[in-house]
């Protein structure tokens, strides 16, 4: 039977992403936040909020209205990996999908992020297509 949304036969590989989901972008570099926000907007995601580090992001997350977290690794205050660990340790936040967007391409750091529970990892610089692919893969996996 064909999928009604896409006409796919068997397993539908297209993911229906909620374009209105609220996305928190965390990066200490305002230009990078703007780049990510613009790329997300180009992909149809316009409901974004921003924080400049993990310390600023946590209160926003604790309000409970964020559907997806995009965070840098290297930030002053609380780093992205520390933020990820806080999210995974919090009963209300532990299922929140998290994408790490960072210049850190070392194998050890990718492994550390995976062990801390990241859902996806993109190394800067990246394209809108790479970002779209990562987001789709994350939401395919979490179903």
Model-found features: residue ranges?
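Two-component/phosphorelay signaling modules centered on CheY-like receiver
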Residues: 30-49
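Alpha4 helix (beta4-alpha4-beta5 surface) of REC/receiver domains from two-component response regulators
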Residues: 37-38, 82, 105-120
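Helix N-cap/capping motif at the beta->alpha junctions
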Residues: 50-59, 80
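Short amphipathic alpha-helix used as the core "switch/output" element in two-component signaling
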Residues: 59, 81-94
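Active-site beta3 strand of CheY-like receiver
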Residues: 64-70
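C-terminal output helix
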Residues: 126-135
């Amino acid at each position: 039977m064909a999928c009604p949304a896409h006409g796919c036969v068997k397993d539908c590989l297209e993911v229906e992403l909620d374009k209105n989901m609220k996305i928190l972008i965390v990066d200490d570099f305002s230009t990078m936040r703007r780049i990510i926000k613009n790329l997300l907007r180009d992909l149809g995601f316009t409901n974004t909020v921003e924080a400049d580090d993990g310390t600023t992001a946590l209160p926003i997350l604790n309000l409970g209205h964020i559907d997806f977290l995009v965070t840098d690794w290297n930030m002053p205050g609380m780093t992205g990996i520390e933020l990820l660990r806080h999210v995974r340790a919090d009963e209300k936040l532990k299922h929140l999908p998290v994408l790490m967007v960072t210049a850190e391409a070392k194998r050890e750091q990718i492994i550390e992020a995976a062990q801390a529970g990241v859902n996806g990892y993109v190394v800067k610089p990246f394209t809108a297509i790479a970002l779209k692919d990562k987001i789709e893969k994350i939401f395919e996996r979490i179903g």
